[in-house]
Amino acid sequence: MKLSEIAEFLSLEYKGEDIEISALNSLLKANFTELTYCDGEKNTKDIPHTGAAAILVSKEYENLVPKDTKALITQSPHLSFAFLSKLFAKPLISTAKEKVQNIAKSARIMPNVYIGDNVNIGENVIIMAGAYIGDNVSIGDESIIHPNVVIYNDTKIGKKCHLLANCVIGSDGFGYAHNKNGEHYKIYHNGNVVLEDFVEVGACTTIDRAVFDSTIIKAGTKVDNLVQIGHNCNIGQNCIIVAQTGISGSSELGRNVIMGGQSATSGHLKIGDFSTIAARGGVSKNLEGGRVYGGFPIMLQKDWLKLQAKIAINFKEKSQD
């Protein structure tokens, strides 16, 4: 799509050189054929370093745009990006008249399974009844897909993975832009989900696709039932994520992190290797590895327990007055 066509679609003024835009991408990863955006002061430091062909940016930051990057000036780059994401969204279901599928002869596929176009299914894979396998999905050798699992387009699943009943892999993330009237506009997610080898995903768990790039669950990680993992998360090797945990978008867990039941992160943060978050712990900042944390606001678990004891003693003393 031509940059002039994008400007017209967004009702923006553009009189520069017309160029072809192939896709949308993040500020630092966009290349010379892609369009990106910058919204707010937090990311302005990255504008001079973008390699994008074009950028949606507010007037006040136009001077930071590199000379080889075309600027589309907008009052709300995030909202303009949301509108544009729909224009670049991939089709949910292939319109190909004949599907191309590479399914190993040893794979076992039970009744009422939908398999999309350009799907690769490895040796000794088992796909149980009612599963949905979208376009461009790959499933590694000896993986087991339980009943009614949904695997959306472009998902990559490694070897010997277990996906338990009713889990959903690769659905759109929870991302919206807002106008001045408080109305919400969907951001279409064009990334994917990657599950590396030996990953287990529990029943009724959901893992959202990335806006760009991939949501990644690394090798050996085990995810319990009823867990939510948001878009663009990066979960390290051999993590344990217990039921009803919520991991917000762009959270990064190191290797062998344990998230206790009903714990959560607030997103865009890092938890170091070999950390443990106790049940119901609320993580709202980066955490050093190798320690046990708990409570909210998050702190060392031993300090949280001491605090609870002090509160209980103080309450008891006051009740006796």
Swiss-Prot record:
Its EC number is 2.3.1.191. It comes from the Bacteria. Disulfide bonds: none annotated. Pathway: Bacterial outer membrane biogenesis; LPS lipid A biosynthesis. CDD domains: LbH_LpxD. One of its GO terms (molecular function) is N-acyltransferase activity. Homotrimer. Belongs to the transferase hexapeptide repeat family. LpxD subfamily. PANTHER family: UDP-3-O-ACYLGLUCOSAMINE N-ACYLTRANSFERASE, UDP-3-O-ACYLGLUCOSAMINE N-ACYLTRANSFERASE 1, MITOCHONDRIAL-RELATED. HAMAP family: LpxD. This is UDP-3-O-acylglucosamine N-acyltransferase. It comes from Campylobacter jejuni subsp. jejuni serotype O:2 (strain ATCC 700819 / NCTC 11168). The lineage of its organism: Bacteria, Pseudomonadati, Campylobacterota, Epsilonproteobacteria, Campylobacterales.
